[in-house]
Amino acid sequence: MTGVVVEDGRILLLNQDTDAGRSWSLPGGKLEAGETLAQALVREMKEETGLDVLPGRLLYVCDHVPAEVVHMTFEARRTGGTLGDVMAGADTTPIRGVDFVPVAKLPELGFSQRFAELVTAGFPGAGSYMGPKSAIGL
């Protein structure tokens, strides 16, 4: 699952290598035993970004066939914490930094134009099944 935090036209991203060939990604991860989706999102966001968040609406559910997982994207709102206070070993891929990046720069950072458009439009169709993860440009 991933969390999307947008503030003043800027989106929260991790600077880390990804399997998509870009060096920026959305924060998120996997559920641990006994966790709800909301608990997992709160934990992953804190570990990877240093921020406390309040989980919001489900944005999209997608298939991520190569990894044999269902990918869920949630909206989240910052409620506290310290940006960049990343927990050591928070991810299997080292996190080099955390930043709020202008949404308009998403394509320059390797995200698809489709994803940038969805963010800008406020995620039309939120809460729906979108098919493959590529359908939302991730």
Enumerate the language-model features and the residues they cover.
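Short connector loops at helix/strand junctions that flank enzyme active sites
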Residues: V6, L26, V53, A67-H71, ...
